[in-house]
Swiss-Prot record:
Keywords: Cytoplasm, Endonuclease, Hydrolase, Metal-binding, Nuclease, Ribosome biogenesis, rRNA processing, Zinc. It is found in: Cytoplasm. This is Endoribonuclease YbeY. It comes from Pseudomonas putida (strain W619). GO terms for molecular function: metalloendopeptidase activity; RNA endonuclease activity; zinc ion binding. Its EC number is 3.1.-.-. Belongs to the endoribonuclease YbeY family. GO terms for cellular component: cytoplasm. InterPro entries: MetalPrtase_cat_dom_sf_prd (IPR023091), YbeY (IPR002036), YbeY_CS (IPR020549).
Length: 157
């Protein structure tokens, strides 16, 4: 079971709780243990501040992942970590890349959850594995390959 804390720190339109939960559960289904995580939906100012504080980048990015660093045995429910998603960046990217907003949201939530599970895309082989899993999960939802046009790669971090 997934214990999901959803925090909306913006008045912008965002996917509903059920959609956010469904995307997380899809990405986390390989994990058999109960899990706890937070998704915080933020505006451009908070997104920029967090990206600057934690990554020393002076711009808002689409999704930030903060994996928990607490041993599972110390918790009642293992804490995966937190995702911070910058709503205006997601909206802007979807429009610029000609993607449906729903598909882009699903991609970024799944992408962030995979980071919480330890996936990464720094090395080419890691990126290939992570992107293949993202493609598979998004296809199950009926969404197109988010990497079909590499010039419009949606992951900016």
């Amino acid at each position: 079971m997934l214990e999901l804390d959803l925090q909306r720190a913006t008045d912008a339109a965002t996917p509903d709780d059920a959609a956010l939960r469904a995307w997380c559960e899809l990405a986390l289904r390989q994990r058999s243990a109960d899990s706890e995580m937070t998704i915080r939906l933020v505006d451009e100012a908070e997104g920029r501040e967090l990206n600057h504080t934690y990554r020393h980048k002076d711009y808002a990015t689409n999704v930030l992942s903060f994996p928990a660093d607490v041993p599972d045995e110390l918790l009642d429910i293992p804490l995966l970590g937190d995702l911070v998603i910058c709503v205006p960046v997601v909206e802007r990217e979807a429009a610029e890349q000609g993607k449906s907003l729903q598909a882009h949201w699903a991609h970024l939530v799944i992408h962030g959850c995979l980071h919480l599970l330890g996936y990464d895309h720094i090395e080419d082989d890691e990126a290939e594995e992570m992107e293949a899993l993202e493609r598979e999960l998004l296809a199950e939802l009926g969404h197109p390959d988010p990497y079909a046009d590499d010039e419009n790669d949606s992951i900016t971090h």
